[in-house]
Amino acid sequence: MSDFTPTEMMTIAAARALTNDDVCFVGIGAPSAACNVARLTHAPDITLIYESGTVGTKPDVLPLSIGDGELCDTALFTVAVPEMFRYWLQGGHITTGFLGGAQIDRFANLNTTVVGPYDHPKVRLPGGGGAPEIASNCGQIFITMALSKRGFVEKLPFITSMGHGEGGNHRERLGMKTKGPTRVITDLCILEPDSVTKELTVVSIHKGVTREQISENCGWAIKFADEVIETPTPTDTELSVLRDINARTKKAHEAA
């Protein structure tokens, strides 16, 4: 089972970033797939929390939304949304938040609000939901997005969820005590913020991908770390788990 798609590589690389001890606030879509692959492989005791208030959920299929009944059915317990945000999130009980977005800039700020001017946008996006609070209050943030010039842009038209702001110690100057984004996992590479400037820097390149491909698909002059490794390819077990849960999800949603 050596063949895999760029999306599978991205999902599995994201799953590997999680540990067995994490308490993770999970976003819908790619973050949900990554978190559940981690739970079904190397991190069986990870605690997955969704915005709707489900704690310790272990879904057999991936949810379509935070209100999917599968999340409540398999949760250890469910709390009200105000408690979820005030006690769990703002109370500092969540180690890792997993987010995606429509657009991201070099300092890992995210836009899920509008493309184009706010008053007259070309596209109006779904909005932030709980993402701004997640980005501010989780111990650290992982982001999953496909690398493209459309998504990785020089300047965001709107900042929905703050990453590292203008770079440097911007979060600290605003009184934010959490780390913010520590890793961005894409279908071509993995990026981490520079320790000083906080600009996203390529630290790992997926097998078969070139530096030229990465540069061509980014909206700014992307930087590479002094030492860049090759991302380990997915194992047969990782691919099997991911494909099985995707197949179950497709079947369940087609039958619904």
Please report, for each region that a protein language model flagged, where it lies by residue.
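N-terminal active-site beta-alpha-beta segment that forms phosphate/nucleotide-binding
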Residues: M1-A75
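Flexible, glycine/charged-enriched surface loops at secondary-structure junctions
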Residues: M9, D21-F25, K223-T233, A256
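Acidic/aromatic/glycine-rich contiguous surface patches that form carbohydrate-binding/processing clefts
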Residues: E227-A256
